[in-house]
Protein backbone atom coordinates (compact mmCIF):
# COMPACT_ATOMS: atom_id res chain seq x y z
CA UNK A 1 0.00 0.00 0.00
CA UNK A 2 2.85 2.33 0.86
CA UNK A 3 4.39 1.65 -2.54
CA UNK A 4 1.11 2.52 -4.26
CA UNK A 5 0.79 5.79 -2.33
CA UNK A 6 4.40 6.68 -3.14
CA UNK A 7 3.80 5.92 -6.83
CA UNK A 8 0.67 8.08 -6.87
CA UNK A 9 2.57 10.97 -5.29
CA UNK A 10 5.34 10.69 -7.90
CA UNK A 11 2.79 10.70 -10.73
CA UNK A 12 1.14 13.83 -9.31
CA UNK A 13 4.55 15.51 -9.08
CA UNK A 14 5.33 14.66 -12.73
CA UNK A 15 1.91 15.89 -13.87
CA UNK A 16 2.52 19.15 -12.01
CA UNK A 17 5.84 19.66 -13.79
CA UNK A 18 4.25 18.92 -17.17
CA UNK A 19 1.52 21.47 -16.49
CA UNK A 20 4.13 24.12 -15.72
CA UNK A 21 5.98 23.31 -18.94
CA UNK A 22 2.77 23.57 -20.98
CA UNK A 23 2.01 26.94 -19.41
CA UNK A 24 5.51 28.24 -20.16
CA UNK A 25 5.77 26.76 -23.67
CA UNK A 26 2.22 26.38 -25.05
CA UNK A 27 3.44 24.97 -28.40
CA UNK A 28 5.70 22.38 -26.84
CA UNK A 29 4.60 18.77 -27.08
CA UNK A 30 2.15 19.25 -29.92
CA UNK A 31 2.45 16.86 -32.84
CA UNK A 32 4.28 18.65 -35.67
CA UNK A 33 2.71 18.67 -39.12
CA UNK A 34 4.24 18.77 -42.62
CA UNK A 35 7.65 17.96 -41.22
CA UNK A 36 8.24 20.78 -38.77
CA UNK A 37 10.34 20.74 -35.64
CA UNK A 38 8.61 22.90 -33.05
CA UNK A 39 10.77 24.76 -30.58
CA UNK A 40 9.87 27.49 -28.06
CA UNK A 41 10.89 31.06 -28.81
CA UNK A 42 13.83 32.26 -26.74
CA UNK A 43 11.97 35.32 -25.51
CA UNK A 44 8.68 33.46 -25.09
CA UNK A 45 6.80 36.09 -27.12
CA UNK A 46 4.73 35.29 -30.23
CA UNK A 47 5.28 37.33 -33.38
CA UNK A 48 2.58 39.96 -33.72
CA UNK A 49 0.79 40.20 -37.08
CA UNK A 50 1.64 43.89 -37.37
CA UNK A 51 5.33 42.99 -37.32
CA UNK A 52 4.90 40.76 -40.35
CA UNK A 53 4.12 43.53 -42.82
CA UNK A 54 7.79 44.36 -43.38
CA UNK A 55 10.67 41.94 -43.10
CA UNK A 56 13.00 43.35 -40.40
CA UNK A 57 15.93 45.28 -41.84
CA UNK A 58 19.45 44.00 -41.26
CA UNK A 59 23.10 44.53 -42.08
CA UNK A 60 24.59 41.06 -42.10
CA UNK A 61 27.01 38.80 -43.91
CA UNK A 62 26.88 35.62 -45.93
CA UNK A 63 28.71 32.52 -44.72
CA UNK A 64 31.82 33.56 -46.67
CA UNK A 65 32.00 36.91 -44.89
CA UNK A 66 30.59 39.12 -47.65
CA UNK A 67 28.35 41.97 -46.49
CA UNK A 68 24.63 41.63 -47.13
CA UNK A 69 22.05 44.37 -46.55
CA UNK A 70 18.33 43.72 -46.58
CA UNK A 71 17.68 46.94 -48.49
CA UNK A 72 19.69 45.81 -51.51
CA UNK A 73 19.00 42.08 -51.13
CA UNK A 74 15.24 42.37 -51.56
CA UNK A 75 15.30 45.28 -54.02
CA UNK A 76 17.32 43.37 -56.60
CA UNK A 77 14.93 40.38 -56.64
CA UNK A 78 11.39 40.13 -57.98
CA UNK A 79 10.79 37.74 -55.07
CA UNK A 80 12.94 36.44 -52.22
CA UNK A 81 12.08 33.19 -50.45
CA UNK A 82 13.60 33.37 -46.97
CA UNK A 83 14.06 29.99 -45.30
CA UNK A 84 14.81 29.75 -41.57
CA UNK A 85 16.53 26.54 -40.52
CA UNK A 86 19.10 25.10 -38.14
CA UNK A 87 21.77 22.45 -38.51
CA UNK A 88 20.33 19.66 -36.32
CA UNK A 89 16.76 20.02 -37.61
CA UNK A 90 16.17 16.96 -39.80
CA UNK A 91 13.15 18.37 -41.71
CA UNK A 92 15.21 21.51 -42.39
CA UNK A 93 18.12 19.56 -43.83
CA UNK A 94 15.87 17.23 -45.82
CA UNK A 95 14.26 20.12 -47.74
CA UNK A 96 17.55 21.80 -48.74
CA UNK A 97 17.64 20.00 -52.10
CA UNK A 98 14.09 21.17 -52.86
CA UNK A 99 15.02 24.73 -51.95
CA UNK A 100 18.05 24.53 -54.24
CA UNK A 101 15.81 23.40 -57.11
CA UNK A 102 13.40 26.23 -56.29
CA UNK A 103 16.25 28.74 -56.33
CA UNK A 104 17.17 27.69 -59.87
CA UNK A 105 13.56 28.09 -60.97
CA UNK A 106 13.27 31.52 -59.35
CA UNK A 107 16.51 32.70 -60.94
CA UNK A 108 14.77 32.53 -64.33
CA UNK A 109 12.17 34.97 -62.99
CA UNK A 110 14.62 37.28 -61.26
CA UNK A 111 14.07 35.78 -57.82
CA UNK A 112 16.15 33.90 -55.26
CA UNK A 113 16.12 31.73 -52.15
CA UNK A 114 18.01 32.94 -49.07
CA UNK A 115 18.73 30.75 -46.05
CA UNK A 116 19.09 31.88 -42.45
CA UNK A 117 20.54 29.28 -40.07
CA UNK A 118 19.59 30.38 -36.55
CA UNK A 119 22.74 28.78 -35.08
CA UNK A 120 24.96 31.11 -37.12
CA UNK A 121 23.64 34.38 -35.68
CA UNK A 122 26.38 36.71 -34.41
CA UNK A 123 28.81 35.02 -36.79
CA UNK A 124 29.42 31.94 -34.66
CA UNK A 125 32.42 30.36 -36.43
CA UNK A 126 31.70 26.77 -35.41
CA UNK A 127 28.05 27.05 -36.42
CA UNK A 128 29.00 28.63 -39.74
CA UNK A 129 31.48 25.83 -40.45
CA UNK A 130 28.88 23.17 -39.62
CA UNK A 131 26.26 24.87 -41.78
CA UNK A 132 28.63 25.21 -44.73
CA UNK A 133 29.49 21.50 -44.53
CA UNK A 134 25.83 20.49 -44.66
CA UNK A 135 25.05 22.94 -47.46
CA UNK A 136 27.97 21.60 -49.48
CA UNK A 137 26.86 17.98 -48.99
CA UNK A 138 23.36 18.90 -50.17
CA UNK A 139 24.68 20.80 -53.18
CA UNK A 140 23.21 24.11 -52.04
CA UNK A 141 24.45 27.17 -53.93
CA UNK A 142 21.97 29.83 -52.80
CA UNK A 143 23.03 32.50 -50.32
CA UNK A 144 22.87 31.83 -46.59
CA UNK A 145 23.27 34.78 -44.24
CA UNK A 146 23.62 35.73 -40.60
CA UNK A 147 23.19 38.92 -38.58
CA UNK A 148 23.37 40.22 -35.01
CA UNK A 149 21.02 38.35 -32.68
CA UNK A 150 20.19 41.64 -30.94
CA UNK A 151 19.13 43.33 -34.18
CA UNK A 152 15.47 43.53 -35.20
CA UNK A 153 16.01 40.66 -37.62
CA UNK A 154 17.74 38.69 -34.86
CA UNK A 155 14.82 39.23 -32.48
CA UNK A 156 12.46 38.22 -35.28
CA UNK A 157 14.41 34.98 -35.70
CA UNK A 158 14.32 34.29 -31.95
CA UNK A 159 10.54 34.68 -32.06
CA UNK A 160 10.06 31.72 -34.40
CA UNK A 161 8.38 28.70 -32.80
CA UNK A 162 8.82 26.11 -35.54
CA UNK A 163 11.52 25.09 -38.00
CA UNK A 164 11.75 25.11 -40.88
CA UNK A 165 9.75 28.28 -41.49
CA UNK A 166 9.70 30.01 -44.85
CA UNK A 167 8.70 33.59 -45.69
CA UNK A 168 8.07 35.12 -49.09
CA UNK A 169 9.25 38.73 -49.46
CA UNK A 170 8.61 41.07 -52.40
CA UNK A 171 11.13 43.53 -53.84
CA UNK A 172 9.90 46.27 -51.48
CA UNK A 173 10.71 44.19 -48.42
CA UNK A 174 7.09 43.35 -47.68
CA UNK A 175 6.22 39.90 -46.34
CA UNK A 176 3.61 38.33 -48.61
CA UNK A 177 0.86 36.37 -46.85
CA UNK A 178 1.48 34.03 -43.95
CA UNK A 179 4.69 32.03 -43.44
CA UNK A 180 4.97 28.42 -44.56
CA UNK A 181 5.51 26.47 -41.34
CA UNK A 182 7.13 23.10 -41.85
CA UNK A 183 8.99 21.62 -44.82
CA UNK A 184 7.95 22.65 -48.33
CA UNK A 185 8.42 19.11 -49.63
CA UNK A 186 4.74 18.09 -49.56
CA UNK A 187 2.44 18.95 -52.48
CA UNK A 188 0.17 21.00 -50.22
CA UNK A 189 3.02 23.09 -48.82
CA UNK A 190 4.56 23.52 -52.26
CA UNK A 191 1.28 24.82 -53.69
CA UNK A 192 0.89 27.30 -50.84
CA UNK A 193 4.42 28.56 -51.40
CA UNK A 194 3.93 28.91 -55.16
CA UNK A 195 0.84 31.09 -54.67
CA UNK A 196 2.80 33.43 -52.41
CA UNK A 197 5.66 33.56 -54.91
CA UNK A 198 3.26 34.45 -57.74
CA UNK A 199 1.75 37.21 -55.59
CA UNK A 200 5.17 38.64 -54.74
CA UNK A 201 6.17 38.72 -58.41
CA UNK A 202 2.88 40.45 -59.25
CA UNK A 203 3.60 43.01 -56.52
CA UNK A 204 6.99 43.76 -58.05
CA UNK A 205 5.32 44.84 -61.29
CA UNK A 206 3.20 47.47 -59.54
Question: Residues of each region from the PLM?
Answer:
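Aromatic-flanked redox-active Cys/Sec active sites in thiol-based oxidoreductases
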Residues: 83-89, 118
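Short, internal strand/loop/helix patches
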Residues: 129-172, 180
Amino acid sequence: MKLLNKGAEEIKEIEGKLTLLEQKFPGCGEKPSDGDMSVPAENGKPIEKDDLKKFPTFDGKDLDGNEVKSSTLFAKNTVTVVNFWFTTCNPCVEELADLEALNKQLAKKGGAVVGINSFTLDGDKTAISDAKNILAKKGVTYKNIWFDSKSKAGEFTSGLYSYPTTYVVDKNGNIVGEPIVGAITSEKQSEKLQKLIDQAIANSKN
